[in-house]
Curated annotation (Swiss-Prot):
<feature type="binding site">
    <location>
        <position position="235"/>
    </location>
    <ligand>
        <name>Fe cation</name>
    </ligand>
</feature>
<dbReference type="GO" id="GO:0046872">
    <property type="term" value="F:metal ion binding"/>
</dbReference>
<keyword id="KW-0479">Metal-binding</keyword>
<dbReference type="InterPro" id="IPR026992">
    <property type="entry name" value="DIOX_N"/>
</dbReference>
<keyword id="KW-0408">Iron</keyword>
<feature type="domain" description="Fe2OG dioxygenase">
    <location>
        <begin position="154"/>
        <end position="254"/>
    </location>
</feature>
<keyword id="KW-0847">Vitamin C</keyword>
<dbReference type="Pfam" id="PF03171">
    <property type="entry name" value="2OG-FeII_Oxy"/>
</dbReference>
<dbReference type="GO" id="GO:0009815">
    <property type="term" value="F:1-aminocyclopropane-1-carboxylate oxidase activity"/>
</dbReference>
<feature type="binding site">
    <location>
        <position position="180"/>
    </location>
    <ligand>
        <name>Fe cation</name>
    </ligand>
</feature>
<dbReference type="GO" id="GO:0009693">
    <property type="term" value="P:ethylene biosynthetic process"/>
</dbReference>
<dbReference type="InterPro" id="IPR050295">
    <property type="entry name" value="Plant_2OG-oxidoreductases"/>
</dbReference>
<dbReference type="InterPro" id="IPR027443">
    <property type="entry name" value="IPNS-like_sf"/>
</dbReference>
<comment type="similarity">
    <text>Belongs to the iron/ascorbate-dependent oxidoreductase family.</text>
</comment>
<dbReference type="Pfam" id="PF14226">
    <property type="entry name" value="DIOX_N"/>
</dbReference>
<dbReference type="GO" id="GO:0009835">
    <property type="term" value="P:fruit ripening"/>
</dbReference>
<dbReference type="InterPro" id="IPR044861">
    <property type="entry name" value="IPNS-like_FE2OG_OXY"/>
</dbReference>
């Protein structure tokens, strides 16, 4: 099996741009994941985010998690299939931030997370334009496709997770296998404790921890908009007996009322090869369905949305 794709973004500026773009396209077509190094986010900022995240978990969340899970380990044989061995909270950035409302964060932590989110947003839009270039779409098409009808903005937020040592890793997953419902996911993960895996060709493959990297993975909405040229893939977090794994997954998703459908240019390009197979829907409707079916295959979700597509038949497509 090929090695996990790592993209050096500095090479996009020189003579190796074409080869680097090809690597990105191959990663999107065959992996649904790739890892960015030498990106635009300062390593000093990433170090601060990591320090503050780990301090916050230790001070405010670790004991709560231990107390919550202690009793559940006893019934693990019954409950493990419906539980994830993770401690999380969620920060919303767009369309309206809730950062000031998150309890127990210091002013320093809020300031650093705000700056980090701004850098991630710019990086997400840069990556989306790289995808547009590879797909032959107009620059900015994916950003426009993600824009909410009302706000003109995407939905953007960060899931802050810690995966503590697990005494029964044979029974618990850190996070059960799933595809991500949204658009583009940017992950800043622990560079010391592994655990993230993706499903490729029927085998679980480790996503290697690398210092100061950002892992990119594609969500279900990218699969729909690209008419299946790029696909979301199943991934999971494996619980570990040693070490606490930090994970900050930032989701650059469509606005809740954004209308999602295959890009007409891609449907036309592939018309001779296959028929359009992906539905047209409002993103919020998909999220409502996903909430109850997250840990199941994505294909039945797409089928349900196809059946509901008549409800949005009168909505106008985005033009290229």
């Amino acid at each position: 099996m090929d090695s996990f794709p790592v993209i050096n973004m500095e090479k996009l500026e020189g003579q190796e741009r074409a080869a680097t773009m090809k690597l990105i396209n191959d990663a999107c077509e065959n992996w649904g994941f790739f890892e960015l190094v030498n990106h635009s986010i300062p390593v000093e900022l990433m170090d601060e985010v990591e320090r503050l995240t780990k301090e916050h978990y230790k001070k405010c969340m670790e004991q709560r998690f231990k107390e919550l899970m202690a009793s559940k380990v006893e019934g693990a044989v019954v409950d493990a299939n419906d539980m994830d061995w993770e401690s999380t909270f969620f920060i919303r950035h767009l369309p309206v931030s809730n950062l000031s409302e998150i309890p127990d964060l210091t002013d320093e932590h809020r300031k650093v997370m705000k700056e980090f989110a701004e850098k991630l947003e710019k990086l997400a839009e840069q990556v989306l334009d790289l995808l547009c270039e590879n797909l032959g779409l107009e620059k900015g098409y994916l950003k426009m496709a993600f824009a909410g009808t009302t706000t003109g903005l995407p939905t953007f937020g960060t899931k802050v997770s810690n995966y503590p040592p697990c005494p029964r890793p044979e029974l618990f997953k850190g996070l059960r296998a799933h595809t991500d419902a949204g658009g583009l996911i940017l992950l800043f993960q622990d560079d010391r404790v592994a655990g993230l895996q993706l499903l490729k060709d029927g085998e679980w493959v480790d996503v290697p921890p690398m210092n100061h990297s950002i892992v990119i993975n594609l969500g279900d909405q990218v699969e729909v908009i690209t008419n299946g040229k790029y696909k979301s893939v199943m991934h999971r977090v494996v619980a570990q007996t040693d070490g606490n794994r930090m994970s900050l997954a930032s989701f650059y998703n469509p606005g809740s009322d954004a209308v999602i459908f295959p890009a007409p240019a891609l449907v036309e390009k592939e018309a001779e090869e296959k028929k359009e197979v992906y539905p047209k829907f409002v993103f919020e409707d998909y999220m409502n369905l996903y909430a109850g079916l997250k840990f199941q295959a994505k294909e039945p979700r797409f089928e349900v949305m196809k059946m509901k597509a008549v409800e949005t038949a009168n909505l106008s497509p985005i033009t290229t």
